[in-house]
Curated annotation (Swiss-Prot):
Keywords: Cytoplasm, Hydrolase, Magnesium, Metal-binding, mRNA processing, RNA-binding, rRNA processing, rRNA-binding, tRNA processing, Zinc. It comes from Mycobacterium tuberculosis (strain ATCC 25618 / H37Rv). Mg(2+) binds at residues 647, 691. One of its GO terms (cellular component) is plasma membrane. This is Ribonuclease E. It comes from the Bacteria. Its cofactor is Mg(2+); Zn(2+). Its main location: cytoplasm.
Length: 953
């Protein structure tokens, strides 16, 4: 729609049929070329009802609205023409002024409604006085000659571009792309802009064509000098001081601006300056840092995320469920003391501890004098080096390899640093003495992990010197947590904090008080020894406190009233456990049992305690990569440098009724429980990613995730289940307790260095003789073995004979005899002698047979490939892009693959038989005289070409 067009005539009655019977308000507004607000106002004026843009109106109301809006438009157009009619008849001074004055629209009221599809008809309107332009006649007169030529060649509806004034473009261009003459470069910038507008006011509706690509219907299209100046003032921006020389004229308001005009200045960002100074980009390419310690900030973020997740996380188990599951599980601890029989330290003793729940091993620990754990030991170390960029310090603890102390593990209150100025280089200096505790054993090339936040573990609680808060395990019921809080208010000293363990459930106040007093006395002894060593300045690290053996630690942390019994095999282990339990928990002595391995009547030794409880068998299966589920599914556990990945497969489990969703969900539920058991048994720590089989229903996915979370409630170490990723992967983190099962009983392979592969200098050809790749698995295993055995039997039954001439070869003689018998039967009808057929058979070149066999083989492969492609397409359509075919491994279900294997094997035999017919020296295989190879019916495509049978009539 073009401004200046007069209102069209009222619609004819025939136009009423163009509107539908019923339409919405916004559709009617779009049809009439106006806004929904004006249509709603017209409807309210007609019947007084309040409607919205989505209300429905019938054809009668739509016609009334159209007539009403057309009447208002016609009245507004007549009034506008009558007011300015005397001024429009004035004679302009020149043709240029005529074109300029007739097309200027300054503050002239435009009709709000214009019917669609009406041809634009310009009407004469006067030129309103422009208050913003002071020297309009001067520059119009100066440029009349130059613009006259441009107006003669310019079309009436030429679209003008805003290339010079658009965002992101320079303002120093003075080209003639908009019809401006070259000699305008000497004029002020304001005069250039306004002269261009005066020369092209006939197409002012296209000033903002780059902003509105859809058309010119809903835009204000006046094109006057005042409107153009306002738009230019809004878009005017001042560049930086290092801009072009042409921007000097833009410092401050332009001459055509009214008084008190504000020029907005866009201050570039620091990132933009850095990016533009190098490569002109708008994004920052510099690495940014944070104020303070990065590790402390990461620690704060983890705490915030943990608190937020704790608020959103629903309770995993209620108190009743917690107590019921705790009492329902039968827990037994078995300890075995053995002598090492393999190098490098044969003859040394080691101890194994296994925790069984309902007869299934869920946790395993191993300890020896040579591989004692350092976790919990307290040392007076000496700072060797401080790395501010890594926010870490290396501390000598007297164990050969330096330990690493990160900034997040520094006790800042003890160091006298608080607030934001927490930098490790301010707290520690090389040569300083520092009391540290080992929080993680050295692994591989990494040293021990250290912390200055010392904690002493007791039987019922953990004593934290210098802390001011108390914590209670979330695994305890709410009522028990409240009881323990009241006890701690009276027991815990003001200069220390405690963390209540799950073993303190139901414990009396006197026992907790005694545990706190014992741990506090131990800490005072450690402080006194550290102070004495500092005064001596011996210059060497000193061990202030060492944790007891792993056997004692496991008994202290795990063995409580929940266990049915503790079975011990070995005199040394029995003496250690019996002495500790009598001193710490005399009420649990009745649950101790010593296993005696008496010899049998025939002199054979009794089975081992681990053999009796089938622990060795379960440990051997736990060291395998693949784990079988009770229903037949499998888990594949792979350990990488960054994380542990677990893949869930259905394996042999095909379901017992129901549909695929039920089968997959049942398999995933079993996998969730077994995954938690494997994590505890193998002591897997770090990031764990689980790939469950895809489920369609959201309720089933929530059920599997809930089962996984409930199973993890039995794990005593710290863990956290994160959200499910967009790919359907479940990710969680778990803290390792000690040495893992596989790490304790394995070493890296000397051949492949633990990679599991052997590298060769040349590429390895993994293709079989048939030209197809060998596919490992159970689908083709049976059939492939059968085919190979039959092929080997065929080869064993043939004899090696010298090469014959083509005509004397026994194969051709047998073929000739067969053809002669066929010809003999056909002589009665056709009368052809059999000798001719024999001659034709004898004269046939051997290459024809070779080609025939090759053609049969190629035809077989093509047919099988077509069938396989069809099956694959059908599977893709049925699964709807769900990746279930990799997870669902159904054995012996693809008969087409077996048939293709049979055809390929037959084709191989045919090729081998025909290989020696080309006259090459050597030996060929011929059937033996005394034994015949077993035959098998062959498929049609392998025996003869496709088509109807050929009759020799």
């Amino acid at each position: 729609m073009i401004d200046g067009a007069p209102p069209s005539d009222p619609p004819e009655p025939s136009q009423h049929e163009e509107l539908p019977d019923r339409l919405r308000v916004h559709s009617l507004a779009r049809t009439l070329g106006t806004t929904s607000r004006r249509v709603l106002d017209a409807l309210t004026a007609l019947d007084g009802r309040v409607r919205s843009a989505h209300s429905t109106v019938d054809r009668v109301d739509a016609v009334r609205v159209r007539d009403l809006l057309a009447t208002h438009l016609e009245t507004a157009g007549v009034l506008a023409a009558s007011v300015h009619a005397p001024e429009a008849s004035e004679e302009p001074e020149s043709r240029l002024m005529l074109e300029t004055q007739e097309t200027r629209n300054a503050d002239v009221e435009r009709p709000h409604y214009m019917p669609l599809f009406v041809a634009p008809q310009p009407i004469p309107e006067p030129l309103a006085d422009d208050e913003d332009v002071d020297d309009g006649p001067d520059y119009v007169a100066d440029d009349s000659d130059a613009d006259d030529e441009g107006q003669l060649d310019r079309p009436a509806n030429r679209r003008r571009r805003r290339g010079r004034r658009g965002r992101g473009r320079g303002r120093g261009e003075q080209g003639g792309s908009d019809g401006d003459p070259v000699d305008q470069q000497s004029e002020p910038r304001a005069q250039q802009f306004t002269s261009a507008d005066a020369a092209e006011t006939d197409d002012g509706d296209d000033r903002d064509s780059e902003d509105t690509e859809a058309g010119d219907n809903g835009e204000d299209e006046n094109g006057s000098l005042e409107a153009g100046n306002r738009r230019r003032r809004r878009r005017r921006r001042r560049k930086s001081a290092s801009g072009d020389d042409n921007d000097a004229a833009l410092e401050g308001p332009l001459p055509d601006d009214p008084p008190n005009t504000v020029v907005h200045e866009r201050v570039p960002r620091a990132g933009d300056k850095a990016g533009n100074s190098q490569d002109g980009g708008s994004g920052s390419t510099e690495i940014k840092g944070i104020d303070g310690s990065t590790r402390l900030e990461a620690k704060r973020q983890r705490r915030r995320d943990g608190r937020d997740a704790g608020r959103r996380r629903p309770p995993v188990l209620s108190e009743a469920e917690f107590l019921a599951r705790r009492e329902a599980v039968e827990r037994v601890m078995v300890v075995r003391d053995r002598v090492r029989t393999e190098p490098p330290l044969p003859g040394t003793r080691y101890t194994q501890i296994a925790v069984l729940e309902d007869g299934i091993v869920v946790e395993h620990f191993v300890t020896s004098a040579a591989s004692a754990s350092l976790v919990g030991n307290i040392y007076l170390g000496i700072v060797q080096n401080v790395l501010p960029s890594m926010e870490a310090a290396f501390v000598d603890i007297g164990r050969g390899r330096n330990g690493v102390l990160y900034a997040g593990e520094v006790n800042w209150d003890a160091a006298g640093l608080g607030g934001a100025d927490r930098k490790i280089e301010q707290a520690l200096k090389p040569g300083d003495y520092v009391v540290v505790q080992v929080s993680k054993d050295p692994v591989g090339h990494k040293g021990a992990r250290l912390t200055t936040q010392v904690s002493l573990a007791g039987r019922f609680l953990v004593y934290v010197p210098g802390a001011s808060s108390t914590g209670i395990s979330r695994k305890l019921p709410d009522t028990e947590r409240q009881r323990l809080k009241e006890i701690l208010r009276e027991v815990v000293p003001s200069d220390a904090g405690v963390i209540i363990r799950t073993a303190s459930e139901g414990v009396k106040e006197d026992d907790i008080r005694a545990d706190v007093a014992r741990l506090r006395e131990r800490w005072e002894q450690i402080e006194a020894k550290a102070q004495e060593t500092k005064e001596k300045a011996a210059g060497a690290a000193v061990a202030l406190y060492e944790e007891p053996d792993v056997l004692v630690k496991v008994i202290r942390d795990l063995f409580n009233e929940d266990f049915v019994g503790l079975i011990v095999s070995g005199d040394e282990a029995w003496n250690t456990i019996n002495e500790y339990v009598n001193s710490v928990a005399p009420e649990l002595v009745s649950k101790l049992t010593k296993y005696e391995s008496a010899d049998g009547p025939d002199g054979q030794s009794a089975p081992d305690v681990f053999t009796v409880h089938r622990i060795d068998e379960q440990l051997a299966k736990a060291m395998d990569r693949k784990v079988w589920l009770p229903s037949g599914g499998t888990l594949v556990i792979d350990r990488t440098e960054a994380m542990t990945v677990i893949d869930v497969n259905t394996g042999k489990f095909t379901g017992a009724g129901g549909n695929l969703e039920q089968t997959v969900t049942k398999n995933n539920l079993e996998a969730a429980e077994e995954i938690v058991r494997q994590l505890r048994l193998r002591d897997i720590g770090g990031i764990v990613v689980i790939d469950f089989i895809d489920m369609v229903l959201e309720s089933n996915r929530d059920l599997v995730l809930r089962r996984l979370t409930e199973s993890l409630a039995r794990d005593r170490t710290r863990h956290q289940v994160s959200e499910v990723t967009s790919l359907g992967l479940v990710q969680l983190t778990r803290k390792r307790l000690g040495t893992g099962l596989i790490e304790a009983f394995s070493t890296s392979c000397p051949n492949c260095s633990g990679r599991g592969i052997l590298l060769h200098a040349d590429p390895v050809d993994s293709a079989a003789a048939t030209g197809r790749k060998s596919e490992p698995g159970a689908r083709r295993g049976k059939r492939s073995k059968k085919s190979r055995s039959e092929e080997s039997s065929d080869r064993s039954m043939v004899a090696k004979v010298p090469v014959h001439a083509p005509g004397e070869h026994p194969m051709f003689k047998a073929m000739a005899a067969g053809l002669s018998s066929l010809a003999g039967r056909g002589d009665e009808e056709s009368g052809e002698p059999a000798a001719e057929l024999a001659e034709q058979a004898g004269d046939q070149p051997p290459t024809d047979l070779d080609d025939t066999a090759q053609a049969d083989f190629e035809d077989t492969e093509d047919t099988d490939e077509d069938e396989d492609e069809l099956d694959a397409d059908e599977d893709l359509e049925d699964l709807d892009d769900e990746d279930l075919d990799e997870d669902l491994d159904v054995e012996d279900s693809d008969s087409d693959d077996e048939d293709s294997d049979e055809d390929a094997a037959d084709a191989d035999v045919d090729e081998e038989d025909a290989a020696g017919l080309d006259g090459s020296p050597g030996e060929v295989d011929v059937p033996g005289v005394t034994e015949l190879a077993p035959t098998r019916p062959r498929r049609r495509v392998a025996g003869r070409p496709a088509g109807p049978p050929i009759r020799l009539d």
